[in-house]
Amino acid sequence: MARSLLLPLQILLLSLALETAGEEAQGDKIIDGAPCARGSHPWQVALLSGNQLHCGGVLVNERWVLTAAHCKMNEYTVHLGSDTLGDRRAQRIKASKSFRHPGYSTQTHVNDLMLVKLNSQARLSSMVKKVRLPSRCEPPGTTCTVSGWGTTTSPDVTFPSDLMCVDVKLISPQDCTKVYKDLLENSMLCAGIPDSKKNACNGDSGGPLVCRGTLQGLVSWGTFPCGQPNDPGVYTQVCKFTKWINDTMKKHR
């Protein structure tokens, strides 16, 4: 049961970015998952603060990464092209410009998405590809995959070096509202497996929830400790923001 309803909102919202000096968030990870098949998520990126994991993200364009708004920093190092953090063969690209959705709220995490503009283009390859943005929203019951380098244990943390994946199912707003009450907003999407620990956790924030080959969610928040049965993970529902994503990339080319 979500004890979070009794906690202050900033504690309840597992804002899933690893804490760094001067930043507001605390991270999310993959619980009860397994290493992703090598190269199966070529759009996955890690946002680093120095060499430390801060958040996940997803490549939507050679110059643009989509992530959660609560992952905002002044500067980013973007890791892409390898499932292993610290791999010297990976591309590492600096980024200093980011654009939060104008409707984002630090209190409720509504509209929790942000575009990060890379200082130079990513080199596309078999290991670096753009994710496909959705043309429609997927229905409840759809099986999706969430991925990230976040902690695999909670409340104690154990961070993997290899990208982790777990399959979850989309949950209807009606069923998710039974857990989170008025904390759930129209821009949010819930996913999980009933009576299972399968979920995202610290460090996974901003990472992709991919359903049938399209990006449907970005890891946003959940209850703590992570992986509590019947407490779904909460994601930003990307299908409701495709126009903002495309308009923002065009405006800031």
Curated annotation (Swiss-Prot):
GO cellular component, one term: extracellular space
Pfam families: Trypsin
Recorded catalytic activity of this chain's protein: Cleavage of proteins with aromatic side chains in the P1 position
Gene Ontology BP terms: epidermis development; extracellular matrix disassembly; positive regulation of antibacterial peptide production; protein maturation; proteolysis
GO molecular function: metalloendopeptidase activity; peptidase activity; serine-type endopeptidase activity; serine-type peptidase activity
Activity-regulation annotation: Inhibited by Zn2+ and Cu2+ at low micromolar concentrations. Inhibited by SERPINA12.
Protein name: Kallikrein-7
EC number: 3.4.21.117
Domain Peptidase S1 stretches: 30-250
UniProt effect for mutating residue 109 to A: No zinc inhibition
Keyword Disulfide bond on entry: yes
Free-text function comment from the UniProt entry: May catalyze the degradation of intercellular cohesive structures in the cornified layer of the skin in the continuous shedding of cells from the skin surface. Specific for amino acid residues with aromatic side chains in the P1 position. Cleaves insulin A chain at '14-Tyr-|-Gln-15' and insulin B chain at '6-Leu-|-Cys-7', '16-Tyr-|-Leu-17', '25-Phe-|-Tyr-26' and '26-Tyr-|-Thr-27'. Could play a role in the activation of precursors to inflammatory cytokines.
Propeptide residues per the UniProt entry: 23-29
Annotated glycan sites: 246
InterPro entries assigned to the protein according to its UniProt record, in alphabetical order: Peptidase_S1_PA (IPR009003), Peptidase_S1_PA_chymotrypsin (IPR043504), Peptidase_S1A (IPR001314), Trypsin_dom (IPR001254), TRYPSIN_HIS (IPR018114), TRYPSIN_SER (IPR033116)
Active site, UniProt feature: 70 (charge relay system), 112 (charge relay system), 205 (charge relay system)
